[in-house]
Each structure stands twice: as C-alpha cells, then as structure tokens.
Amino acid sequence: MAKSIRKRVITVQYISLFVSIILFASSCAVQKAQRSLLNTPALKGAHVGIAVYNDTKGAWIDQHQSDYYYTPASNTKILATYVGLQFLGDSIPGWKMAENADTLFLFPQGDPSFLHPEFSYQPVVDLIQKTNKQVVIATTQSNDRFESMGDGWAWNDYAEDYQPERSRMPVYGNVVHFYDNGKSLQIKPFHFFKNQDIQYEAVKAKQWSRKKSTNDFFVTTQKNSAKYFQVPFVTNPEKDIQLLNDSLHIAKPIQVLKYSPQLAQRTIKTVPTDSLLKIMMSRSDNFYAEQVVLLGSAQLLGRIDDATFMDSLIKTEFNFLPQPMRWADGSGLSRYNLNTPENYVAILKQMQAKFGESRVKNIFEKGGEGTLSAYYKNFPGTLYAKTGTLGGQIALSGFIYTKRQQKLYFSVLVANHMSKTTSAVRKAVEAYLVEIAKRN
C-alpha cells in the first residue's frame, strides 16, 4: 500500500516536472521571439508595444510596453466597428422620413452608401424617383457639431482619395469617380465638369486634382495609369442638392428644407451594417469609418457631434479599458488618437463577448486577404486582424486561432520607426506572431 502511494507521488512529481519544463521552454521561446522582433534592424530606435493574451488559458503570454501609448492609425477602425455593431442594428439607419399630403420630407443621418457605385441597393433613390410629391431634404441640423475634416487631419491631403470630406448627406461617397477604359474617360458625377471640354487624348493616363476650397478640377503633370481612381469634392449642403437634382433628373426638383415639420418620422434602413463594416475593414476605408461614427452619433445623441459622442463612449461603453484612451476620429487619420496594446486586447475580447465570435470574425480580415494580402498566408493557425499605417507608425491588432485550439488576442503597436519600407516592419511582426502561434 505504502509502495503504491509512493509510486503515485513520484508519478505526480514527474508530471509536474514535465509540465514545468514545457512551460519554461514555451516561455523561453516567447522571450526569444520578442527579442528577435525588438532587435530587428527595421525597428532600430523605434518604440514597440506588445500584448498577447491566451483567452483559452486566461493568461498573458507576452507583454512589452503594453501599457504605453501609441498612435494606432487605422487600428482606430476597430472602435468604428464597435460603434457600428453597437448602434446601427442589422442595417444602416441611413435616413428618416416624414410626409404629408403633398410633400415628402427626408432627413439624412450620414449614410455613406447613398448613390455610392459600390451599392446597388438604393431605397432612398427609389423613393425619390417614384413619389409624385415634392421632395425636400434637411441637409443640415442646427445642433450638429462637426467639421468636414476630422480633428488632426493633414490639411494638404484634401485631394487624396483616402481623405474624402465627412457630411450629413454623403453623395457618391463624396468623391468624383473616374473610369478609364482605354478609349474614353467616364466621370461620375459629371456635375462638376459640365462646363469643361474634356478631350480623352489630352487627359489619358493623367492624374486629376482640384483646388483646395472649390470644385475646380484639373489635370496634373503626374502620370496615372489606373483604370479607376477617385478625387474628393468639396461638400456643401445646398450645392449638394443641385448635384442630386443633376443626377436624378426628377420632374420636381428637390428643395432644401428650411424648417422642421411637426410630423411623425420613421427610419429608412439601407445596406446591411455588417456588409459595410466588412468592406471598411477589408480595404481600410477611411470614409466609411468616419460616416459610421457620425451615424452612431445621430443614433445616440439625435445630432451629429462626433467629439461629444466619442467622449461619451469613452466614459460608458469603454469604461472597462485598462488605460484611458484618446479618441479623435473614426478612421485613424488623426495623429491625435492615442491607445495602448492592452486596450486593444480588452476591446477585442469585449467585442467577441458582446456581439458574437462568428459575427466579429466575419467582419475582420483573415491573413492573406485585404490589407493582409501579402502576409500570414502560411500561418500556423488562422489570424484575423486590422492593420494600421501612418508615417513612422505601424499597428496590428486582432485574434488568432492556433492549431492547438488556443484563442489568442494580440496587439503590436510600433511608434517612430525609420524604416524606408513598412514591409520590413510588417514582416518582423509577422515572424514574431508566427512563433507565438507555433508555441500555443
């Protein structure tokens, strides 16, 4: 009997020792992977924040400067995704409407899909074209508090396709769409070019731009062989109605609403929320992210006031964060945004718990797709993540399902790197995460 007990004790001791050796080896491997990342030549002089959490085991795997602040760039779109899932329902609450005997009143709420070529479903366009009533649109609301450009944006990027203006009533995505088929140049909307005589041979394979404060478009000396490209236009509530009339060609021209009628309003839902968020995350669409935040503000506050909306969410929806964050816009274009790796891990955990694992997975991009198309193709498991890039800043936050059935949340934020190419930094982060996934 005593011999049997001693045998069991020895067996337990051996098992404990074996487990300890495995854990020690795993810990050493993680530390080695971390050192390899931090010592990468592309990251010389940079600041790197790392947070990796094993949700299956409920334990941190790796942390390095994980409570330090970084400019997260497009990782800010993770917050915009949270807003969309929390406030926008199954389909975008893009408009409100009311009507009386002879007039249809429309109240835009910031829907980015309106007349956007990417979306064939256009319920508001159908409504406008089918009604016999006079259509009037409230293009502004007196208690709105937001600017066409986000706080901290680069002012001289006004003509870049990644920085369209924000508005209560976006039209065509607030950009001019150029289609070059090799024989002709199609422009949509053509509203801004009606007085121009555009000869294709003179503009073929050329880049277009515009003046800073007006919709005066012109061809630059820069080459552009793209078959499709965009240039943002200057939004203006009343002039956008002219653009709308020029596009829809309805019998009774749309008018601007000068007063708010005392009539019951109902919501017009447009495109599926998850479809919009999926596109936003896949190509890191700044315009969609900004408009999602404006839509969220309209839903929660009854007005578009992005600063008040984001401040309110920091105190309520995001009061669980380990560190207080600074949130300046929806897209991450602003360098005023500040966040930590630990915060992103906490946000990702909360999103899956609150909105469902499968729903969140369907919105995030997998390795080898979208902005991750050049990375994580042969990953030991499955990685879902959001990238982020600004000058000197690189970000990647997401979650991993390893081959050993472990779920990991991670965030790697890099500040002030001086690498000539972002790919060198991204490959170093990829090598690190590959090692982490192999060991878990």
Question: Model segments located where?
Answer:
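Bacterial Sec-dependent N-terminal signal peptides
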Residues: 1-37
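Beta-lactamase-like hydrolase cores
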Residues: 28-69, 88-91, 127-134
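Short glycine-rich loop/turn motifs
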Residues: 47-50, 277, 289, 311, ...
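Short beta-strand scaffold segments in enzyme catalytic cores
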Residues: 50-52, 95-98, 397-398
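Small-residue-rich helix-loop
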Residues: 61-63, 293-440
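Active/ligand-binding-proximal structured segments within catalytic/core domains
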Residues: 71-84
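Short alpha-helical patches at coil-to-helix transitions and adjacent helical residues
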Residues: 75-78, 238-241, 285-289, 337-341, ...
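Conserved serine DD-peptidase/penicillin-binding transpeptidase domain
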Residues: 86-323, 438-439
